[in-house]
Amino acid sequence: MAMPTIRHVRAFIVRGGGADYHDQPGGHWIDDHISTPMARYPEYRQSRQSFGINVLGTLVVEIEASDGTVGFAVTTGGEIGAFIVEKHLARFLEGQLVTDIEKMWDQMYFSTLYYGRKGVVLNTISGVDLALWDLLAKVRKEPVYQLLGGPVRDELVFYATGARPDLAKEMGFIGGKLPLQHGPAEGEAGLKQNLEKLADMRSRVGDDFWLMYDCWMSLDVPYATRLAQAAHEYGLKWIEECLPPDDYWGYAELRRNVPRGMMVSTGEHEATRWGFRMLLEMQCCDLIQPDVGWCGGITELIKISALADAHNVMVVPHGSSVYSYHFVVTRHNSPFAEFLMMAPKADEVVPMFTPLLLDEPVPVNGRMKVPDTPGFGVRLNPECALVRPYPR
């Protein structure tokens, strides 16, 4: 059959949860006292929202084909991302065949190179790319994972990220990743509290459950080394994103310093094959965690994953709900997936991008069979107020 072309590209913003999962009301574990690069300043230590972690908000990209089919995706980018989509990127999509995703990605990336490369521009390109995959899969009446080569496993298994790994174990997850609460600015007392928290959690979950620490770019090499060496007693499986994303040299040193058997992970805030090439060739980590909504989308994640596979490094994408699930189920070097516990107390399983998406699947007993609904299999919640700030 003749493939349709792209007729319209539209960009919307929405507040309150969704893809910007830090945009939560008060009392949520994700905005508690968590170590961050800004924790060196006491006034920004207690809450991540205090320094503006949620200022961007969610970006919704909607792409309509000439046959009326509509694909969409969500990511973090807000009004800045909407401006980039409407004022710059739309010209590379409208009028193109829905199949020409590689060409469209290439033109979006290289046309923004002078002000992009990473950050909100790559978030935005990622959102457009995911919407293109959703659109193409809907045109072909297939789930996205079939376009990626088909599943290599019957179901996904998950670890949980949240404040209560002990409850995650009861829910059937294979492991739990804790947010590190205290960084270098809080001295020896903070380091002691980090280790006490880990010891307490190990006593609750037993020895047969993974425990990991998410350090969210907040440490330096000496502190991260001390933390890793002391945490080894409690069976820490990996230590995550300890350093700023551009400190490839520090990551390489840290990987040499950690105890034998403990993994170093990073990549949540890295982007494109070129950024991950640095991590891989400099032997910075044992597993990479690209976020498909930030690293360049599915089109770029395919390349990143192949590069990692050639280096015998696992790919465990960061969060991103269905956009990750459809990829992970198709890759041998992605043996498990992450699930962000978005219940305020991390005490129940709720959809990761709630309330924005409908039909968003969640793990049951830590497992999930990825739905075979066309596209990514989700719908926008009509009760969420979408605003199009830059209509054309």
Curated annotation (Swiss-Prot):
Detail the disulphide connectivity of this chain as listed in its UniProt entry. Answer: none
Q: Pfam families per the record?
A: MR_MLE_C, MR_MLE_N
Where Mg(2+) binds, per the record, is at D214, E240, E268
GO MF entries? L-rhamnonate dehydratase activity; magnesium ion binding
Site feature: Transition state stabilizer: E338
Superkingdom of the organism of origin: Bacteria
A single BP term in Gene Ontology: amino acid catabolic process
Which EC number(s) are documented for this chain?
4.2.1.90
Report the active site residues. Answer: H318
Return the annotated site residues (Increases basicity of active site His): D291
On cofactor binding, the record's note says: Binds 1 Mg(2+) ion per subunit.
Q: Which UniProt keywords apply?
A: Lyase, Magnesium, Metal-binding
User: Which sites bind substrate?
Assistant: H22, R48, E338
- Catalysis performed (reactions): L-rhamnonate = 2-dehydro-3-deoxy-L-rhamnonate + H2O
Q: Which InterPro entries match?
A: Enolase-like_C_sf, Enolase-like_N, Enolase_C-like, L-Rhamnon_dehydrat, Mandel_Rmase/mucon_lact_enz_CS, Mandelate_racemase_C, Mandelate_racemase_N_dom, RHMD-like
Q: What class of enzyme is it?
A: lyase
Cofactor(s) essential for the protein: Mg(2+)
More info: Reaction proceeds via a syn dehydration.
Q: Which family does it belong to?
A: Belongs to the mandelate racemase/muconate lactonizing enzyme family. RhamD subfamily.
Cross-referenced NCBIfam families: PRK15440.1 (NF011968)
Q: How does it assemble?
A: Homooctamer; tetramer of dimers.
Summarize the protein's role: Catalyzes the dehydration of L-rhamnonate to 2-keto-3-deoxy-L-rhamnonate (KDR).
Q: What's the name of the protein?
A: L-rhamnonate dehydratase
Provide the gene name from the record. rhmD
